From Swiss-Prot:
Encoding gene (name): phnX
A GO term from the CC aspect: cytosol
Cofactors: Mg(2+)
GO biological process: DNA repair; organic phosphonate catabolic process
Matching InterPro entries: HAD-like_hydrolase_sf, HAD-like_sf, HAD-SF_hydro_IA, HAD_sf, PGP-like_dom2, Phosphonoacetald_hydro
Family membership: Belongs to the HAD-like hydrolase superfamily. PhnX family.
Enzyme class: hydrolase
Listed name of the protein: Phosphonoacetaldehyde hydrolase
Function: Involved in phosphonate degradation.
Keywords: Hydrolase, Magnesium, Metal-binding, Schiff base
Catalyzed reactions per annotation: phosphonoacetaldehyde + H2O = acetaldehyde + phosphate + H(+)
UniProt cofactor note: Binds 1 Mg(2+) ion per subunit.
Organism in which the protein naturally occurs: Vibrio cholerae serotype O1 (strain ATCC 39315 / El Tor Inaba N16961)
GO molecular function, one term: phosphonoacetaldehyde hydrolase activity
Length: 271
């Protein structure tokens, strides 16, 4: 089989390749708010800004009108940076302790990765997780057989994380990619798709395996068509804001999209 005009596919982690439904970070955000301040947030509120670095994520949750109102009522003042620091301090050990429990690959992701590699395409990756958490997740995912060629954590770069392009571009540099147009960014969350656009890459959003659908693997596997379509539409309404080039259900559907991108590249198109 001929080598591909695509040089690299850069995957997000939770909700994209591992952790169907992206439950590791969301459930722990709820727990960290509870542990840090005895303050309740819902899973839906925890999911809202998913894809950002985790400190920025806590800050964004605090700015949600529903959360800000309850915080003001409970504490008599708005959330401030020292509060975010305290919640983040509670978040980190919880996440480090539990992230390995959510390292199982999303169905068909390993086969898709191997299929992509067989075409001579590099496998990059980046995450909203900080390095301390990623080191645990990388090892756990490797035990399942997932070993990307490069990994960038959200706090690796002084310039910052998503939605800026820096983590994606760090993959470009380290993987020796010669043209960002030959890269595809795959993500289940809005900031990750925006990151791909900002890096000049093709972007693919995932509707059913990630944060926006919020389905467990079991719910997904046993859902009827109506339930799946409702989840699909819910995720699409959010992800479409970033105007991804493609929207698919899960990484299992990625090979067909990559074939289309290859044809577009060969025809001289750019993202």
């Amino acid at each position: 089989m001929m080598n591909s005009p695509i040089q690299a596919v850069i995957f997000d982690w939770a909700g994209t390749i591992v952790d169907f439904g992206s439950f590791a970070p969301t459930s722990i955000f709820v727990e960290a708010f509870k542990q840090g301040f005895d303050f309740e947030i819902s899973l839906a509120e925890a999911r809202e800004p998913m894809g950002l670095g985790k400190w920025q994520h806590i800050e964004a949750v605090g700015k949600l009108p529903t959360v800000a109102q309850r915080w003001q009522k409970q504490f008599g003042r708005p959330m401030q940076a020292s509060d975010i620091d305290a919640i983040y301090a509670a978040f980190m050990p919880l996440q480090i302790a539990k992230v390995a429990d959510h390292a199982a690959p999303i169905p068909h992701s390993l086969e898709v990765v191997e299929q992509i590699r067989s075409r001579g395409i590099k496998i990059g990756s980046c995450s909203g997780y900080p390095r301390q958490v990623m080191d645990v997740l990388i090892a756990a995912a490797a035990d399942y057989g997932y070993r990307p060629d490069y990994v960038v954590a959200t706090d690796d770069l002084a310039q910052g994380g998503r939605p800026a392009p820096f983590m994606a571009l760090k993959n470009v540099i380290e993987l020796g990619v010669t043209d960002v147009r030959a890269c595809v960014k795959v993500d289940d969350a809005l900031p990750g798709i925006e990151e791909g656009h900002n890096a000049g890459m093709w972007t693919v959003g995932l509707l059913l395996s990630g944060n926006e659908a919020g389905l467990t693997l079991e719910e997904y596997q046993h859902a009827d068509d109506q339930t799946l379509q409702a989840a699909r539409e819910r995720a699409q309404a959010k992800l479409q804001q970033a105007k991804p080039h493609y929207l698919i259900d899960t990484v299992a559907d990625l090979p067909a999209v990559l074939a289309q991108i290859e044809q577009r590249l060969l025809a001289g198109e750019r993202p």
